[in-house]
Amino acid sequence: MIISMWALYAIIAAVLWGVDYALTERALQTIRFPMLLSIELFFGFLTMLGIAIFSGSYKTDLAGLFSSNRAIALVVAIVVAFNIANMFIVLSIGDKNATLSGLIEISYPLFIALFSWLFFKENNLSAGAILGGIFVLTGVSLIYFSNK
């Protein structure tokens, strides 16, 4: 069986998020979250800017972005949500630990489904996905209440 690229990308992302969260827990013993996030985001900016310039996509993307008020609004909302979410997960890791914070955060796909429906009227849920979501919520509740 050959794995689809989208699934491989998601697995790689999950592994790297695991590395990031474990390292974040240790880094927060030395530095505070604003500095850690500033460093992460600064180098992320440089990396992505380099990729955009090298691939040549920046010209097309900037033209597309600034030709649409909707695109600008979406990007602003994404930047706000991304930065606030990063701040809260790092605060959670610092307050408890990377393992429990990550296990609670794993519920975010439920919110993807909710907001995709609320914002765009998209419904990508199957019976299996709904059942899986119920298991996720049950697991999150079990983790939270057994680790207060």
Question: What do these predicted ranges mean?
Answer:
Residues 12-27:
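N-terminal signal-anchor/start-transfer transmembrane helix
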Residues 110-130:
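C-terminal transmembrane-helix exit sites in multi-pass transporters
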Residues 13, 78, 105-108:
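Structural signature of transmembrane alpha-helices in multi-pass secondary transporters
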Residues 1-12, 29-34, 42-76, 83-95, ...:
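Membrane-interface interhelical linkers
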Residues 36-37, 101:
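Juxtamembrane helix-start motifs in multi-pass secondary transporters
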Residues 18, 22, 49, 79-84, ...:
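Hydrophobic/small/kink-forming positions within alpha-helical transmembrane segments
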Residues 25, 90, 116-117:
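Small-residue-mediated transmembrane helix hinge/kink sites in multi-pass secondary transporters
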